[in-house]
A protein has these predicted regions:
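Alpha-helical transmembrane segments of integral membrane proteins
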Residues: 2-3, 12, 90, 94-128, ...
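Hydrophobic alpha-helical transmembrane segments of membrane transport/permease proteins
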Residues: 15-65, 158-179
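Juxtamembrane/transmembrane-helix interface segments of polytopic membrane transporters
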Residues: 18, 22-26, 147, 151, ...
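Hydrophobic alpha-helical segments of polytopic membrane proteins
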Residues: 5-7
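Residue-level recognition of pore/gate-forming positions within transmembrane alpha-helices
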Residues: 11, 19, 41, 136, ...
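Membrane-interfacial helix-loop-helix junctions in multi-pass membrane proteins
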Residues: 52-61, 73-86, 167-180, 187, ...
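Membrane-water interface segments at the C-terminal ends of transmembrane alpha-helices
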Residues: 22-28, 58, 66-69, 134-164, ...
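An internal, D/E-rich "acidic patch" concept
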Residues: 57-113
Length: 313
């Protein structure tokens, strides 16, 4: 219990450090947002006035503390480019990236767990060798290449969906889920292959341990031993890997959103970086960092349930 509390404390400390570094990074990189907005021909007086309006003339720590206090209340400031609250912009983009991330992760779980168990139970067989070969191919193909291929085959050739014709869940939930399926598959395929490989290796490693032979000596079948004992122990490293995968999906969605013209956080982030719209970029970076830290904390708590030894620490 003490270790769990320490873990949560470290999580909060990590968020503070990440927020500070994110805020600091955009203060030291070359370029002035005021000059970017007004142009290089603007007079020094106009630039100074805009910097004061944007709060860039105040001390760094004062601006950071004010930004953190605002962020805790859901106020990430005002966009330099669009002159609107960043929180309002996020409200329109987060559901898109959230739905894409959720669908991708569901696909990963739905296919990788059964396939990992299947290949481990039939290790060395023809199907296992075939799956290993397919996994190697899937892991070698970048998600954006898969996305382009899916767009060409299912969008342009078979016309199962209209490329670039984003459908909002609020307007048509069924049509939206169908459109999101293709970018979700693009993200999920290489990660399914990696998770299958990880789970297969973990199960095969557990099958070599003494408790498996003890279970067999008590009359338990291979199937019963696998599902009652082996799988629980084998899932520890897989859960940690899935946590990293859940975090990686958000990063991978940046390119996929471009390929499928999805109005999510990824596209907004790229546009904001190009425009030096620091409040938007800072907010996205902190939100992504929070997601990464959160899924790793959840992975630890799940592993604590799977492994009683962690609960005793």
């Amino acid at each position: 219990m003490k270790y769990a509390a320490k873990k949560i404390g470290l999580t909060l400390l990590t968020m503070v450090i990440v927020s500070f570094l994110a805020f600091l990074a955009f203060q030291v990189i070359p370029g002035d947002p005021a000059v970017k907005l007004l142009g290089t021909e603007a007079t020094p007086e106009r630039i100074a006035a805009l910097r004061a309006e944007m709060g860039l003339d105040r001390p760094f720590l004062e601006r950071y503390v004010q930004w953190v206090l605002g962020a805790l209340k859901g106020d990430f400031g005002t966009s330099y480019s669009y002159k609107m609250p960043v929180s309002s912009m996020l409200a329109g983009k987060l559901p898109v990236t959230g739905l894409l991330t959720g669908m991708s992760f569901v696909l990963i779980l739905a296919f990788s767990i059964p396939l990992g168990i299947f290949t481990a139970r039939h290790a060395g067989g023809r199907l296992d060798r075939a799956m290993t070969a397919v996994n190697q191919v899937l892991m070698a193909i970048p998600a954006f290449v898969t996305g382009i291929l899916l767009t060409y085959v299912f969008g342009l050739v078979l016309r199962w969906f209209v490329p670039g014709n984003y459908v909002s869940p609020g307007d048509n939930l069924g049509g939206s889920l169908w459109y999101f399926l293709f970018p979700a598959v693009s993200i999920a395929l290489p990660r399914v292959a990696m998770t299958v490989k990880m789970l297969r290796s973990s199960i095969l490693s557990e099958l070599q341990k003494d408790y498996v032979r003890t279970s067999h000596s008590r009359g338990n079948s291979d199937r019963a031993t696998l599902y009652r004992h082996v799988l629980r122990n084998a899932m520890g490293p897989v859960v940690s890997f899935l946590a990293m995968t859940a975090a990686d999906i958000v990063a991978g969605s940046v390119v996929i959103e471009q390929v499928f013209s999805l109005p999510g956080l990824g596209r907004m982030l790229l546009t904001s970086i190009a425009n030096r719209d620091y409040p938007v970029v800072q907010a996205v970076v902190v939100i992504v960092a929070f997601w990464v830290v959160l899924v790793n904390l959840l992975a630890y708590l799940i592993n604590q349930r799977l492994d009683p030894r962690l609960r005793l620490q």
